[in-house]
Amino acid sequence: MQRALYDPVDPQLLGSLAPDLQFRVNGEVYRFGDEKTLRRFMQEPELWCGLLRDPVNGSRFRPSTRSPRVYFVGGPYYFASDSTRDRFLDDPGRYEVKRAL
């Protein structure tokens, strides 16, 4: 079985392994086929990232432009509630998701 990773903004493009065509949201790595789709994703990640896991309580949710968020170590973190965002800010190293690029 062949598996390919597609660009989340333009599924016609294959995601690149190049470090300059990658972006993190909640610690998850997203890969892009070109700079244009990467820039578009970075402007509004909540439109393209799909379901996320709140790094504090593990709940799954679909972020929106109104979702609580903070920027930490290379990308945005979205939260299911203000209370989990506040807990994250109290000790971000504890909740940071670490994934290798």
How should these model regions be labeled?
Residues 7-10, 23, 54-57:
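Short cysteine-rich clusters marking metal-coordination/redox-active sites
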Residues 14, 61:
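Cys/His-rich microdomains that often coordinate metals
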